[in-house]
UniProtKB/Swiss-Prot annotation:
Pathway: Cell wall biogenesis; peptidoglycan biosynthesis. The gene is ddl. It catalyses: 2 D-alanine + ATP = D-alanyl-D-alanine + ADP + phosphate + H(+). It is found in: Cytoplasm. This is D-alanine--D-alanine ligase. Keywords: ATP-binding, Cell shape, Cell wall biogenesis/degradation, Cytoplasm, Ligase, Magnesium, Manganese, Metal-binding, Nucleotide-binding, Peptidoglycan synthesis. It comes from Chlorobium phaeovibrioides (strain DSM 265 / 1930) (Prosthecochloris vibrioformis (strain DSM 265)). Its EC number is 6.3.2.4. It is an enzyme of class 6 (ligase). The keyword Electron transport does not apply.
Amino acid sequence: MKQVTVALLFGGRSAEHEISIISAQSVARHINPDHYRVVPIYITRNGRWYSEGIASSILELDIAALIRKSGTAAASLKLQEMVLASGQQPFSFTFAGIDIAFPILHGSYGEDGRIQGFLDTVAIPYTGCGVTASALTMDKALSKLCVSEAGIAVAPGVTVLAGDWEKSPEQILSSIPETLIYPVFVKPAHLGSSVGISKVSVQGELPEALAHACNLDTKVLIEQAMHGKEIEVAVLGNNDPIASACGEIEPGSDFYDYDDKYIHNTAKLFIPARLPEELSRRVQADALTAYRALGCRGMARVDFFVDEKSGQVVFNEINTIPGFTDISMYPQLMEAAGIAFPELCDRLLQLALEPEQPAKT
């Protein structure tokens, strides 16, 4: 069998830069070397692309340990130093000979349709969702509208544009409906890994949280906090996707934030989730409905809040390039479904080669 050449894209311009590297390291370890030749392509925070030499060195760096020991800022500085010390010139490589791209670029400029559009333009097939689905799912406000239209419950909330907040914060605060019950979460609409999210317990805390989120994004959501368990479902496939069993997150802090995910690692994961079987099946069905409603293909992780007492299932968000780190839920859910990490990588690469077809009804 001829080896397939895979461009592994990682790093990127988003706040999730370091997490992307850790995910790419996991993928590189698990791709079958008998079937695939991996060409690492590292994208710096300022958008410079490097292949082979420095990209390979970064894949070997234990960046997870560095983050835990010294923090994200120290890890970022280390990466910059490595690039400078390499003396390597950016963009000094060709896409000739690349058969498939495997973007592991979390957040902006990777998960939002931009890299997908570039790859479509140069006619390189790639893992995961296409341009439209990536752009829709990256925008938490738009994805909520789509899944709500498909009949899935969403949290009550309002959307604030950063430009409007900057011009007239008093008007924005006065326009927030009194029916919104505190606590609420203030979320940048286009960021992942819980970056920029604040929990607001009383109205007086809202201006600071909004100012912080509007500093990070052009659009912000204010969402009523939902009671219940944080449940995640891994979905895999194109026209006939499959849903994993439900996974449950028990946060180690007030909510499942960036530090809890990647630095302190205090959250507990339960696979399968501690839910009645009938309720679990409903969540799985809603995950597939959301996946199809948003036009996803390849993979996604769909997140919900589930109140076991009332039976309420509320859509939270969808991630089209979920984490692939050792502690990430997506590969663990697939492992529990009988799809080991190497097979998961293989399936994603094979799905990337399937032509898009109208979904079956």
